[in-house]
Amino acid sequence: HYVLNGSKMWITNGGVAGLAIVWAKDDENKIRGFIVDRDLKGFSVRNIEKKFSLKASVTSELIFEDCRVPASQMLEVVGLKGPFSCLNNARFGISWGALGASMACYDEALNYSKTRIQFDKPIASFQLVQAKLVEMFTDITLGQLLALHVGRLKDKDQADPAHISMAKMKN
C-alpha cells in the first residue's frame, strides 16, 4: 500500500465524487496517480463555500491524513504526462461548457430584444442592439469553430496543450 498525506485544493465535484484520481510523489520522487475511494480511512472532503464564480459545480478540498491506498490502486502512468492529460481534457471540456453558457445568454438577449418595447417598437429593431447581437453571435461561432478544430486535432492525437489552452481562453 501507499500512504497519502496532504491536500488538494479547488477540485471540481470533489464533494460528490465517489472516488478521486490523485497525483502525488512517491518515495523515489516520481509522480504517480492513485485511484482513491472516498470511503478510505484518512480521506476527507471539505467543500469550498462562497465562491465568486463556477457556482454551477461543487468545488472542494481533498484532505489526506495517513490515507492508506492499496498498491493495486496505483495507475501505470509515471510522471506529469498523466495529470497534464487529465488537465488538458478538462480544459477542452470547459471550452465547450463556456460555449453552451454563451449560447444560452445570446438566446436570452435575442428573445429579450424582440419583446422589450421602447419608443413603440422592439429594441431588436435598433441598429446598435442588432450590432451587439451580431457581435455576440459571431464571437460564439468563432469559439465553436475553434473548439471543433481542437476536437478534430484531439481525435488525430495532434492537439498541442497550447491549442487546448487557446480554446479555453477564447471561450
Predicted regions and their residues:
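Glycine-rich phosphate/pyrophosphate-binding beta-alpha loops
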Residues: 9-15, 54, 89-93
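Residue-level preference for beta-strand/loop junctions
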Residues: 16-18, 56, 127, 163
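A general structural signal for short secondary-structure junctions and capping/turn motifs
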Residues: 25, 53-55, 169
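Short clusters of hydrophobic/aromatic residues that line enzyme substrate/ligand-binding pockets
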Residues: 43-45, 52-54, 74-75, 83, ...
